[in-house]
């Protein structure tokens, strides 16, 4: 949508380069074959969109009969990229260049950039990469800098791209835009994103989950994002989402696909320890999508999670 924060970059960068910008009609995001045809008809060369759009196209086999032949580059942002669906897309369009981006609105768009070149297993998360120019991205555990591989920390951002704060909301501003604990300069601020990440073996940042999606279950600290990655990699599952029901202390797996629950549980047992296995499964014909093109977790929580 043109009011989405990433649209600022899309609009002005496109026009500044002398390119032509096309806005995809919203109805096409529920009609994958129409969407692919639109890309061909308009001779689209570069796309910047959320992974949900890619998932919809590959899940409904919209590339089987028609491929966007003019496409040269695809950039993803706004959601975790399901690796299985990305591999299916890249297999159909191997000549296209791909990039995975990350960046909250509070940091004026993209903070990290990752050029996807190597191969990934379906269960392996695609990194968000390294910090963009004029931006520093760090992982903090409290006020301590995280540098070790596979150690979880909160993704924090500093640099000239930071916003001044939230309009007419000083309380929220003071919570998120805080003094840099690694610098003596009292006035230097960083933005705590509320997102959790880690470094992989290549030194790349891997997004894990929202901080508020980290739960304590059966005495173990669990990242729901890890369960979602394993769920989305199961054959027959097009998209998956995991929520936690605090009232009953149950992990709820909501998914789009035809896989039977028994087969799904057996597949997850091969990838996850018992304490991370979902306690309840909710199959859907199609995941709800919000106005920004992402999975509507708020709606799913309202419909399928029992609160107080």
Task: Enumerate the predicted regions with their spans.
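Phosphate- and divalent-cation-binding pockets in alpha/beta enzyme and binding domains
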Residues: 56-59, 84-88, 109, 165-166, ...
